[in-house]
Amino acid sequence: LAEQLSHSHIYRGEISHRRFHPKAHSFAYQLFMLALDVDEMEAKQCPKSIFGFSWFNLLRFEEKDYLKGEPESLKQRIKNKVIALSDCEDGMAEVSRITMLVQVRCLGLYFSPANFYFCYDANENCTQVLVEVSNTPWNERHYYLVPIEQNNNDDNSATHVTNKNFHVSPFMNLNMHYQWLFKPPMSNSDKLFIRIENHCNGDNKDDDNKADNKQKVFDATMTLSKKPFTSKAFWQLWCNLPAMTLKILLGIYWQALKLLIKRIPFFGYQKSQPTEPK
């Protein structure tokens, strides 16, 4: 059965966070994410391993964890959200496959700061990415739609800009915008790269955040390598990186404590702004 999962893979590597203003702060850690083909997950295909769909699996896929609260099947929920964030429905007509780069339940616990839904056309070109962002402890979700520009170079410059409309960190306000760069999962590449940059908006006049206009305040970079979606690979992963969800949650609060100690300006909860269609 493992051979049937032609589009699902394990990705393992490193994520780094760097803060540049008002004080420098950085960290990096090892992590894994699963690139799951939506059709294969809806068909409940997987090798016999610690990953599966039952309560006893150490790593468990629950369809309800993604685009939570939306009606219909997972694939249709993704399509509906993409259409809602687009200025037309034509884009989804060209989507033949969706790969979701996500965390799954680990020992029954689920939290994922960001899930990425890569949409591919019939020629296996990734055309757009739906990004599902979650915050803690509020457990809210917000969605960004990022078009992917096709190019054949290795330029790591950010390729798309969206306004920041969702409160994630109490150490950054909402008067910012994101710059995104994706090198998506591809059948002809073993590498995956995602970078998100936070830049101040040009009209940022907040006295507690005196960054220069459009200055880069923060970036997060994830560099991952593809591994086979097999029972052996899952056991190796578990031995090296157990309890991934707990590691993520503890890491968020540990780094927040460090920022408090550094006296980084603190912003109370900020109400999310609606995302406008492209």
Regions from the PLM with identified roles:
Residues 1-278:
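Mature, function-bearing regions of proteins
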